[in-house]
Amino acid sequence: MSKYLLAIDQGTTSSRAIIFSAQGLPVARAQQEFKQYFPQDGWVEHDGQEIWLSTLKVCREAIASSGLQAEAIAAIGITNQRETTLVWDAASGTPIHLAIVWQDRRTADYCAGLKDAGHEAMVSAKTGLLIDPYFSATKLRWILENVPGARERAQRGELRFGTVDSFLLWRLTGGKVHRTDASNASRTLMFNIHTQQWDQDLLELFDIPASLLPEVLDCAAEFGHAEAELLGASIPVLGMAGDQQAALIGQACFEPGMVKSTYGTGCFMIQNTGDQPVSSKNRLLTTVGYRLGGKVTYAVEGSIFVAGAAVQWLRDGIKLISHARDSEALAEATGEACGVYLVPAFTGLGAPYWDPKARGAIFGLTRDTGIKEIVTAGLQSVCYQTRDLLEAMRQDGAAAPSALRVDGGMVENNWVMQFLADILGVSVERPEVTETTALGVAYLAGLQLGLYPDLQAIASHWHRQQRFEPRMSETHRERLYAGWLDAVKRVRSEG
């Protein structure tokens, strides 16, 4: 009997479920967007109940549309938007506050105070991360400080903390299991990536009770069983990874030096660094790539907060386009030398700048500037930010990759992929299956199930759909990029 794997891909703007065959081919999928809440400048929230209900709905829809019986699903894998923070009642499973999303910057002043007090060196040495509102610890502390009675309830053991994966696992198992995986734990600012444990010094710094925290397992492990009444059968959850680490696996970047870049709401470039953590001198992050059989593979990551979100803003915020797909034709009609630079620092700048107080701007406007130039500049901003990350990796001593493997919704845009190759001066490879985040966590579940004997078996399923080669002259490339660097300098809060 064929084995099928259900991947839950809970993202920043939508929840998706994809059923894969053992060969890594999508059989059925379902997707549902959910509401974004922006209560104040720099604040971004989600409703945990909406996350759960949308996830349950797409799982049921995917199973129904596949024509399979629920019993044919051999295992579930969960991948998720990372860092987003939930705290819920241990008895009812009800969140005590809206989820604070990874993009949220409300703790910027608190983070600045920790840096001024000299704590960043210790935090970075233990976690591989920087002190920044992006990560979970300061979000969790904010909830404990600002929800009436939360800290007292946490100290009494009545509350649970989790990133989205942990919350979904709790709900799927009927509140029986409170676990996460090493890749998600490594993004909280509370997890020591060397000891692979929650760190007491960090918990004391952020004033977090240890009773809130989930158990940390490998990325392929026995996480628990989804209750039969939810999906029609009791299905084991055997894989779990943060979305970017899952994409690293889905892209089969198993050798040190291999690089993938995912283009969703944000953009995330990860380079496999092997069994040793590599510290960046250029404000990139050291993180857990994946942990299998107790063995950690580390990675260096650059995180950009706004990629696809820039196109979403062009569509929904200022309504220059009706559909995201319209952007490709407009860019083709404009060309790469549009003279306009859009810096989408809507919630600050991520790597390598880490400037939470920077704000977005458009430069180079003339009387002739129209919709197509601004839309093109929005697309180009994603590629320029990717170049920023690649430059930081090069300055850290990494060799230029022979190719950049790309995935995520934006990579369907051929114009963006060609401009990306041009501005990087590196070949860009788009795989046949671009849902690599979901595919990666399906592979993890399959690995635990025994469908795949090892990572090499998974790598054999990776196939390239198209390769984009650089066509731009170096002179033109560097002139365009210099204009971008000038634009970024102008929006920096430090000037």
Swiss-Prot record:
GO molecular function: ATP binding; glycerol kinase activity
UniProt binding sites for sn-glycerol 3-phosphate: T12, R82, E83, Y134, D243
Enzyme Commission number(s): 2.7.1.30
A Pfam match: FGGY_C
Binding site for glycerol: R82, E83, Y134, D243, Q244
Its job: Key enzyme in the regulation of glycerol uptake and metabolism. Catalyzes the phosphorylation of glycerol to yield sn-glycerol 3-phosphate.
Name assigned to this protein: Glycerol kinase
